[in-house]
Amino acid sequence: MLMIGISMTFEVKASVYQFNFNSIDGKEINLKDFKGKPIFIVNTASLCGFTYQYSDIETLHQKYKKDGLIIIGIPSNDFGNQELSSNQKVKEFCAINFDISFILTEITKIKGEKGHPFFRWVKKEAGFLAFPKWNFYKFLINKEGLLVKWYASTTRPNSNKIK
């Protein structure tokens, strides 16, 4: 009897569930708590030309939260210094101007050695082009915790590309 050895190499994708953030109120957000739900993550800034997208993101949240969609906004000052000076100011700005009800993290570093590991993971999983170059990059995570799509700042949350 002849045994033929077959070997296949494949890459096992890492999931988003390894990451944690701090909420805008200082509470820990464990992404593993959202296993089995799709997650839409957006890096945001309060004083950006794309800030109007907060309204579209909130609309998306209201439309799909009943289906389990989790939306997380990640304020950052890394692109053009366009974020407010404190978490409290960001929280108030979002509440007053956009009536935000989705999850917001604390102001978070994205770029450089001190950048949040989530964004290094995005680059590893989807390549250099997926790494945020500006505010309001968007990342869609499937129910298994895998990054399935990303969108640049110019893609509005209510675009047919995202729905």
Q: What does each model-identified segment do?
A:
Residues 1-7:
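Bacterial N-terminal signal peptides
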Residues 10-32, 52, 117:
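N-terminal "domain-start" segment that seeds a small globular fold
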Residues 23, 43-47:
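Amphipathic alpha-helical repeat scaffolds
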Residues 35-42:
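Local sequence-structure signature of Cys/Sec-based thiol-disulfide redox active-site neighborhoods
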Residues 50-115:
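Structural microenvironment flanking redox-active thiols in thiol-disulfide oxidoreductases
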Residues 117-120, 124-163:
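Thiol-/selenol-based redox modules, centered on thioredoxin-like
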